[in-house]
């Protein structure tokens, strides 16, 4: 089963938030941190998701896995590094 992946990447002078497989941005922000916060919100809402944040060079600088415990509703976040 594929886990949805929400990605933050640079687009001109803004940061766009998209989901893997989409060719358009769901939202755009002037600040990277605002885009990451929005992406994290999408990940929590979808219950099981990955958030990837790219840096200015297009390299993944942040990767987090969000999972929701179905019994308690607690959201767990695991940061991954390459």
Report each predicted region and the residues it spans.
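Surface loops and adjacent helix of pleckstrin homology
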Residues: 20, 54, 65
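A cross-kingdom feature marking charged/low-complexity
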Residues: 2-4, 59-82
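Short aromatic-glycine-(Arg/Gly/Cys) micro-motifs in beta-strand/loop hairpins
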Residues: 2-26
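A short, polar/proline- and glycine-enriched secondary-structure boundary/capping micro-motif
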Residues: 27-30, 72-74
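Compositionally biased, intrinsically disordered low-complexity segments
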Residues: 9-11, 53, 78-80
């Amino acid at each position: 089963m594929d886990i949805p992946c929400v990605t933050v990447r640079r687009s001109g002078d803004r940061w766009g938030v998209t989901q893997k497989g989409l060719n358009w941005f769901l939202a755009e922000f002037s600040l990277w941190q605002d885009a990451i916060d929005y992406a994290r919100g999408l990940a929590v809402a979808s219950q099981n998701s990955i958030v990837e944040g790219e840096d200015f060079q297009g390299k993944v600088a942040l990767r987090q896995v969000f999972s929701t415990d179905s019994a308690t509703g607690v959201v767990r976040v695991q940061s991954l590094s390459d």
